[in-house]
Amino acid sequence: MSTARTENPVLMGMSSQNGQLRGPLKPSAGPGGGGTQTQQINQLKNASTINSGSQQQAQSMSSVIKPGDDWKKTLKLPPKDLRIKTSDVTSTKGNEFEDYCLKRELLMGIFEMGWEKPSPIQEESIPIALSGRDILARAKNGTGKSGAYLIPLLERLDLKKDCIQAMVIVPTRELALQVSQICIQVSKHMGGVKVMATTGGTNLRDDIMRLDDTVHVVIATPGRILDLIKKGVAKVDHIQMIVLDEADKLLSQDFVQIMEDIIITLPKNRQILLYSATFPLSVQKFMTSHLQKPYEINLMEELTLKGVTQYYAYVTERQKVHCLNTLFSRLQINQSIIFCNSSQRVELLAKKISQLGYSCFYIHAKMRQEHRNRVFHDFRNGLCRNLVCTDLFTRGIDIQAVNVVINFDFPKLAETYLHRIGRSGRFGHLGLAINLITYDDRFNLKSIEEQLGTEIKPIPSSIDKSLYVAEYHSESGEDKP
């Protein structure tokens, strides 16, 4: 099925839910979410109530599960994911999550997330992180990095202590909410793990009040957590682990001084875990200064995901919208993300797409945080098929229903391109990346191909659906008749 369309395209009004210009809403086969979008945001906002009911649940569960019982029979497992997966996540050593001697309650949360076996980055990271050693890990986007650090982080928590014991720092507010949600879900059987998400753009007073209650894990953006530390409300003197997710961005010029200021407030015996797809010189410098004999993991024989097929279409600026319209009508889009190079172009393009009759949300950094949160959760829950955005949405955002990424504006940097196309083909699945290239972009195209060691091919007149549509494959990878 191609993208949902109306017979008489009109510009739809502003949604009362998220203030987006959009055409008719057609629920796609997006990833399921627990509860409504509003419920999810409230859950992430209220650290004092997060998992507060889990203690009773875990206690009742543990009273049922006895040594020798087949405890896996009690699990509420999600439907098995039968989509084909690439070697980015299947090329493992054959380990099982049980091999790491994890708490049974943590294993229950892992399996109920649908995580059947550890991915390569999880196999490499989990035992080392459990030993307390610093880690410098380089792995592709969408290969399970969040699980690689959240599993050992949760295993090492001591719930008898009512203090912050672990901190995860991420570069964007949306990624903080996403990681928080994963942490909450994985730890739901552990009996009272308190997770707090704190980001800029939200009420500082609310965060201060929530820190009066017990918090074990903080997921934060750099500026907000430093502010809370300086005010003396975020007590970090008992932190045993700090994780820098998307470390290359966190240690760029935008954040590096803030990160330095955060690190010096932590205990000297803290464990530092760095995860990223790219490691520029700034990361190497930080590693030399702050990591103690780190265990280095490099799973990057190539930079781009194996499951993402890349094409370019040579167009003039005036032809871009027409080309996009053609792609919408010919591609079998589950969900798509469309990138522009400025906030203004994002809004203009979203308006154009809505006028063409396609359902469309947009998101960029200049929007109010409340609207950004709503758009993120609505799109994640499959309420809209297409999302137009800036590079705000390139970092770590994991929406596995996205099978098509379109660079309406081609990026100038190879790093930006790498993170953009990594929004499709998540966790070893198949995806498509299409780049609209103008005359002025041709040198950037060649440069990015050379830097990433990849080939971006001219778009064919017809694209084989088996390259990006999961239904055309069985689990064994054989094409369906």
Curated annotation (Swiss-Prot):
Q: Which UniProt keywords apply?
A: ATP-binding, Cytoplasm, Developmental protein, Helicase, Hydrolase, Nucleotide-binding, Nucleus, Ribonucleoprotein, RNA-binding
Where is ATP bound in this sequence?
A139, K140, N141, G142, T143, G144, K145, S146
Q: What is its EC number?
A: 3.6.4.13
GO CC annotations on file? cytoplasm; nucleus; P-body; ribonucleoprotein complex
Reaction catalysed by this enzyme: ATP + H2O = ADP + phosphate + H(+)
- Localisation: Cytoplasm, P-body; Cytoplasm; Nucleus
Recorded superkingdom = Eukaryota
> Helicase C-terminal domain: which residues?
307-467
Motif DEAD box, residue numbers: 245-248
* Biased composition regions of type Low complexity, renumbered to the chain: 52-63
What is an example of a GO molecular function annotated in this UniProt entry? ATP hydrolysis activity
List every stretch annotated Disordered: 1-72
Q: Which InterPro entries match?
A: DEAD/DEAH_box_helicase_dom (IPR011545), Helicase_ATP-bd (IPR014001), Helicase_C-like (IPR001650), P-loop_NTPase (IPR027417), RNA-helicase_DEAD-box_CS (IPR000629), RNA_helicase_DEAD_Q_motif (IPR014014)
Broad class of enzyme this protein falls into: hydrolase
GO BP, one example?
A: response to heat
- Renumbered to this chain, the Polar residues biased-composition regions fall at 41-51
Helicase ATP-binding domain ranges (all copies): 126-297
Give the motif span (Q motif): 95-123
According to the record's subunit comment, the protein's assembly and interactions are: Component of a ribonucleoprotein (RNP) complex, composed at least of cpeb1, lsm14b/rap55b, ddx6/Xp54, ybx2/frgy2, pat1/P100, eif4enif1/4E-T and eif4e1b. Component of a ribonucleoprotein (RNP) complex, composed at least of elavl1/elrA and/or elavl2/elrB, igf2bp3/vg1RBP, ddx6/Xp54, ybx2/frgy2, lsm14b/rap55b and, in a subset of RNP complexes, stau1/staufen. Component of a ribonucleoprotein (RNP) complex, composed at least of lsm14a/rap55a, ybx2/frgy2, ddx6/Xp54 and eif4enif1/4E-T. Interacts with lsm14a/rap55a.
Q: Which family is it part of?
A: Belongs to the DEAD box helicase family. DDX6/DHH1 subfamily.
Tell me the function of this protein.
Answer: ATP-dependent RNA helicase that is an integral component of messenger ribonucleoprotein complexes (mRNPs), storage particles that mask maternal mRNAs from the translational apparatus during oocyte maturation.
User: What name is this protein filed under?
Assistant: Probable ATP-dependent RNA helicase ddx6
What phylogenetic lineage does the species belong to? Eukaryota, Metazoa, Chordata, Craniata, Vertebrata
Query: What gene is behind this protein?
Result: ddx6
